[in-house]
Amino acid sequence: RQRQMFIRDRTKADTKIKPGCIIEKIDGTNIKSGEDYYPLLSGKAGKQVLLSVYDPATKERFEEQVKPITYGTQSDLLYKRWVEQKRQMVDKLSNGKIGYVHVKGMNSESFRDTYSELLGRCREKEAVIVDTRHNGGGWLHEDLAILLSGELYAKFTPRGQFIGNDPFNRWLKPSCVLMCEDNYSNAHGFPW
């Protein structure tokens, strides 16, 4: 049974497959109950695969062409979904007042992502949750500590019109860091 679907671009999604549908065949090969169907997808990432599907809700059988993804791509999609769910939860529970940023790794790419989220999407928030859970480590602790420890030293308000603060490139508001037991190395030490 199809339990979940990952659609990367909903504007391009044109499928009858939905949770609850049963995939009966892959490229014409029957899938027996309890049988491992993974070998039928081996080496087919990014290639067209024909699925024969049964929808028990409508009693309809149909076929659809799909392109399977790699395990790495699946992991990335699951991660992005998890982050978006946490962001939406924080936004809902705080009535839009608190931002959420996840630091995936303690490396340059993660720092750029964190910086962009924090000083972009979260800039107007009253506070931010910086989530370091499930982080594999790296060398970012000092950069993150500096980014989160900004202190306001100037406000620019010419003729009564507020246009910004200094420092502009550091977080000036309250922050809360989340961590967990599987943070590794630098990610484990950062919150201390």
Regions inferred by a protein language model and the residue ranges of each:
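Cleft-lining beta-strand/loop regions that shape enzyme active-site pockets
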Residues: 24, 29-192
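Serine-centered coil/turn micro-motif
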Residues: 8-11, 138
